[in-house]
């Protein structure tokens, strides 16, 4: 009796049962992503903090595929763009985040920085930075620093 004759019924049963099999190079296919948009964003933050910007960007994109109005993921994606010197793209991310969440003060602050880095007129950057500063909170020192940078550029 050949090995093929013994193995064939098992292979057919596995194939018909829907159980995935491995052949050649192994590939993992995820049929259902168990992570939420927020969890993909958090994973992106972890990748970003370890310097793995490409993986972070992929996670932020996945978060946005799951929830296109996830302002936090959009701001984080803008930060990746900014880190790579793509200020125009970063600006678009921050503007979209503000459309989705008009009180996202990090987005306001980061948009002010993006406008400043692109040499844009400072009126909008100043207004954004002032609004972020007025929000108070634990990130107020960061927002004040941005406002000071905008004011310094205007002199």
PLM regions and their residue ranges:
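TPR alpha-solenoid repeat register
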Residues: 39, 73, 107, 142-143
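Residue-level recognition of tetratricopeptide repeat
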Residues: 36, 70, 104, 139-140
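Position-specific recognition of the canonical hydrophobic site in helix A of tetratricopeptide repeat
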Residues: 41, 48, 75, 82, ...
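Structural marker of alpha-solenoid helical repeat scaffolds
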Residues: 32, 66, 100-101, 134-136
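Canonical tetratricopeptide repeat
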Residues: 42, 76, 110, 145-146
